[in-house]
Design a protein with these regions (language model features):
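Anion-binding and metal-coordination hotspots
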Residues: 1-210
Length: 210
């Protein structure tokens, strides 16, 4: 396990069994470093796949802060209020500060309310803070990627390309068809990037989280 600062400078190295995933090594590496140097107020930043729900809980219980990339598939849940009141409309640079369930779904973020809830640790113990940002540049890149994936799926469905079942292809009774519903859902989320954190807004505004 390798712990680095924001500039990539190595801070600590740890050795683990070769079959141990990063999700199982990051907590002991971080907590050992914090204990060794008597660090308080440390913020762990990681990609979406680096930390599990259990990891986030353990970091929080250890008194550590975190900012973790969120999977775009979480957007429909986190942004349910936005989609209900504003549809698919986003502006370049728009930021939405809201909540995300720690597990599954909960009622902390009520889509019936137009205003996004402000995360409070003591009040929303079933949720984390979620910050979502929209970028027109990212949307254009996502659109190109989805178009390529859709074209690949259409080629497989038409029998023009032999391959294992790609994204946006569904198989029913041995027949392959284009999964138009999944493609439409993916198109709806173009340009969005999310972050999950346990840092209150009064400590770190959304712009700094991003």
């Amino acid at each position: 396990g390798l712990l680095v600062d924001r500039n990539g400078f190595p801070l600590q190295v740890g050795c683990f069994e070769g079959n141990k995933a990063e999700k199982a090594t990051i907590i002991p590496i971080v907590t050992a470093f914090a204990a060794r140097h008597s660090i308080e107020g440390m913020v762990v930043v990681a990609d979406a796949g680096m930390l599990s729900a259990a990891n986030l809980r353990e970091l929080d219980e250890a008194g550590l802060r975190f900012i973790v990339g969120s999977r775009v598939t979480k957007a429909p849940i986190d942004l349910a209020s936005h989609f209900r009141w504003h549809g698919d409309a986003f502006t370049d640079g728009q930021v939405i500060d809201t909540l995300t369930p720690r597990r599954g779904r909960n009622t902390d973020n009520d889509p019936a309310l137009r205003a996004e809830p402000v995360w409070e640790p003591g009040e929303h113990d079933g949720s984390w803070r979620a910050v979502w940002a929209y970028s027109a540049k990212r949307a254009a890149r996502d659109s190109r990627t989805l178009t390529l994936q859709a074209n690949r799926a259409k080629a497989v469905v038409a029998g023009e390309k032999a391959a294992r079942t790609p994204r946006f292809v569904k198989t029913s009774n041995g027949a392959r068809t284009l999964d138009e519903a999944s493609l439409a859902r993916a198109r709806r989320l173009e340009g969005l990037k999310g972050y999950v954190t346990n840092i209150p807004v009064e400590v770190m505004p959304a712009g700094e989280v991003i």
